[in-house]
Structure formats: C-alpha cells, structure tokens
Amino acid sequence: VKVTVLLEELLAAGHAGAEYDAWLINIGSGDQFGSGFVGANPNSKIPALVDRSGPVPQRVFESGAILLYLAEKFGAFLPTDPAKRAEALSWLFWQMGSAPYLGGGFGHFYAYAPFKIEYCVDRFAMEVKRQMDVLDRNLADREYMAGDEYSIADISIWPWYGALAMGLIYEAGEFLDVASYKNVQRWTKQIAARPAAQRGRMVNRVMGDPATCLPERHDAGDFETRTLEKLVAAGEWPKAG
C-alpha cells in the first residue's frame, strides 16, 4: 500500500514518469519464491520495485528503501531542508522498526495464533499502545508526522497505524482503545480523504468491497474498468490457473 500510495501521489502531482505497472503476487501460491520475483527481491517479500526507466533496470526492495528511492528520484514528498529532511527520515525509519511489533507481534498473537497466549497478547498490546501514544503526542502540535509538510513519513506510517486507528485490522479497536488517540484519528482521516491515497489503497487488493479492489494496475483507467467488481461481472475473476 505504501508504495502504490506514493506512486499515485506522484502522478497526481504531475510526475508523469511515475507511471507504473502493479502486478499481483499471490503469496498463497508461492509466487514470491519464483525466479522472476526473487530477482527483484532476494528476500522473497513484497513489495519490490524494478525501475526500467534507465539504461539498466534498477531493483529496489523493502518498502522504506522504495519510498526513499522514489522521493529522491522525483524530488517530491521529502523535504529538502536538512533539518526537515532528517525529521521525515527519522519517522520513516521509526515505522520500519516499529511495524513488526504491530503486525508480526500483536496481530499474530491476537488474531491469527491457533490459541491465545495471554502473556504474548498483553506484551505486544502494551507495545502497540506505546507506539500509538508516541504518534499521538507527535501529532499534537503538527499537521503531519514531520511537520507541516505531507511526506513519505506519513505515507509509510498511515497504512498500518491509520488502519489500526480506525479499527480496520485485527478487530482490536476496542481492545486497544484506539478512539482515545485523537490526534492519530484526525491525521488518519485527513490522509484517507486524499484521492491519491484512496487509489493507492485499492491497488493489488483482492479482499474487501469488490468495488474498491484493483487486483492489478497497469493504467490509470484501470480504476474505472478493472476493479474486482468489474472483473467478476465480466467472468474474468478468479483467474484461470
């Protein structure tokens, strides 16, 4: 989601060179272990990017690296002032280090583990609430994560923590008391209202409201003609094989 949100934001800002193809990688079928994908990401994890705009294709893997690469390539969504840039990068890398505790830690033990282990749930819940408090305090006196400028810091944090703040993942909103983080709630809704963020969130989704799922994106027109709803109606989904 982070990468497609940034790509859609770049296109919306007039950077035509950010036009992209988003292929669906079926991790349930093991697509990520195929030689084609491993060539893009030797760690066999999504996302991965291959930039073919230059004389030699450039691979970039890990979402933080991709966001930074694109922001620098297009000179957008990353402050140029050294102090503001450092603040934005600090929050970008905060997300890289913090999100595993949310997804792989709390999310796993609270929602997916075959049986509940109270200590694990409580330990990771405490950490996630601490993280939400960090975000909430930071947003108390600034519009965006790094100040008054929307940046890749926001784009990196919003998909995970924004979804958590709105109670959209793990059915844990009440358990974590997410409604109490008022500043995160305000920030989440502000970004969710951005058309580019809405489009980016649709890309490569195959679960949820079919009208807001776009399994693959190869052209801007796909948002109107190739949603999951349209593919199912046309008998083109699920794909053969």
Each language-model region and where it sits:
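Short, solvent-exposed turn/loop segments enriched in Gly/Ser/Thr/Pro and often Arg
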Residues: 26, 152, 204-205
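GST-like fold's C-terminal all-alpha helical module
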Residues: 91-195, 241
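GST-like domain detector, emphasizing the conserved glutathione-binding G-site
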Residues: 1-122, 126-129, 143, 229-241
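Acidic/histidine-enriched, glycine/proline-rich intrinsically disordered or flexible terminal extensions
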Residues: 204-241
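Alpha-helix initiation and N-capping motif
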Residues: 85, 181-184, 225
